[in-house]
Curated annotation (Swiss-Prot):
Gene3D superfamilies: Fe-S cluster assembly (FSCA) (3.30.300.130), HesB-like domain (2.60.300.12). Pfam families: Fe-S_biosyn, NifU. One of its GO terms (biological process) is iron-sulfur cluster assembly. This is Fe/S biogenesis protein NfuA. Involved in iron-sulfur cluster biogenesis. Binds a 4Fe-4S cluster, can transfer this cluster to apoproteins, and thereby intervenes in the maturation of Fe/S proteins. Could also act as a scaffold/chaperone for damaged Fe/S proteins. It comes from Aeromonas hydrophila subsp. hydrophila (strain ATCC 7966 / DSM 30187 / BCRC 13018 / CCUG 14551 / JCM 1027 / KCTC 2358 / NCIMB 9240 / NCTC 8049). It comes from the Bacteria. Its cofactor is [4Fe-4S] cluster. The keyword Membrane does not apply.
Length: 192
């Protein structure tokens, strides 16, 4: 469910040494399955353990996950990176905003999942997002851009060279292409 790198495990062990005996870590999602989902890591003292919590054993500590957060933390990774700028703990949970869909789920659900878990996190760096409006009988995904992508001069490139290539690669033979249904209005919100 959750992968914790060796460096992150060492970091947690060091932090937990300063806590009361029996303290572990808890990984959780606030507002799971929504666009406002946020992940977090906290200390979990013994008196805060719920009988329904999942216990994931690691070297020197356990990671506890509540049953509501668990399906949204599938494929989550925690890493601890040190560089010239300092140290940083990263938690990546690609399914926090949307549960992972089955490989045999309807195409529209699988496309939506890829947009939410892979495409939108990249667009979010520019304040943008994309949503699936419809899937046509001709196997075209009709998309709508929002935020910083609306009116951006690079939107055609993003659509054809980024999103379309990625979706066609993931769904060969099931999808023929993508089209933009956005009425673009250039403004201060536009990224480029």
């Amino acid at each position: 469910m959750i992968s914790i790198s060796d460096t992150a495990q060492a970091h947690f062990r060091k932090l937990l040494e300063k806590q009361p005996d029996g303290t572990n870590i808890r990984v959780f999602v606030v507002n799971p399955g929504t666009q406002n989902a946020e992940c977090g890591v906290s200390y979990c003292p013994p008196d805060a353990v719920d009988p329904e919590d999942q216990h994931l054993p690691f070297s020197g500590f356990d990671c506890l996950v509540d049953p509501l957060s668990a399906p949204f933390l599938v494929d989550a990774t925690i890493d601890f990176v040190t560089d010239q700028m300092g140290s940083q703990l990263t938690l990546k949970a690609p399914n926090a905003k949307m549960r992972k869909v089955a490989d045999d789920a309807p195409l529209i659900d699988r496309i939506e999942y890829v947009l939410m878990s892979e495409v939108n996190p990249m667009l979010a760096g520019h304040g943008g997002k994309v949503t699936l409006v419809e899937l046509t009988e001709d196997k075209l995904a009709i998309l709508q851009f929002g935020g910083g992508c609306n009116g951006c001069s690079m939107v055609d490139y993003t659509l054809k060279e980024g999103i379309e290539k990625q979706l066609l690669e993931k769904f060969p033979g099931e999808l023929n292409g993508v089209k933009d249904a956005t009425e673009h209005q250039r403004g201060d919100h536009s990224y480029y």
